[in-house]
Amino acid sequence: MRKMIAIIHYEYKMQFKKLATWGVFLVVTVFTLLDNYPSASNLARLEFLNEPAYFVYRTMSLNGFVLMFGLMFLLSERFPLDNKTGMKLLLMSHALQKKQYILGKLLGGFLYTFSILCIFLAFNTAVYFVVAPFPIPLLECTVPLVKAIIVSAFPVSLFVSLCSVALPGMIDIRLFYLFAAILFGINAAYVGSANAAPFYMITSGDLTRFIWVNPKWSFNDTESILANGAFLMGSGLVFGGLLFLRHRFWRSE
């Protein structure tokens, strides 16, 4: 257990201190504020921008998607980089079990992704609360933020981190990038509507309807919400689990 925690700590700390992480964070945050800043022009352009819940919803579904796309590239190199630098051989020379190594990588990647996404949502919501040219009760910002973290950020982080870390450990990383580009491309092309969203939406699926729902739409399709959650969490756990079954991955195989 101690060795697995050491790997989790290393993965989390190493990724968190990367300049690339904060470069991605900064770029996406700037674009988020340009797009959603409660200025007169943006308030006129976005009908519901005066609602904190809509701001959190939009930040999570649109800008959070771009953030996840950037973090995907940083996460995808974890196993290939260990092979390339010889770190995996070094770790295998110690009394470290396969499951400790894999779990450490996966959990470290998840905690890193979830932390960055939570910081992103909290920071942008705080800016919105401070600069909005109209009074906002603190609870009106806090409640949708907590909802976004629990019902959206958690399953999204689980899906993106486990898939991005695990799949390049099983297949050629270029093939992973191809699959990821197709999925992210389909997600980027989707335009929301009153109808149920496809279950494979990453940040703009029906789980986000817990955060905010367009008052002009009536939506009661709980099945699509469950399908979206099952896809995100189920896919992440399945792909993460498959890595444990891969043969010739560890010294004893």
Q: What does each of the following model-derived ranges do?
A:
Residues 69-81, 117-118, 153-168, 195-212, ...:
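Juxtamembrane/interfacial segments around transmembrane helices
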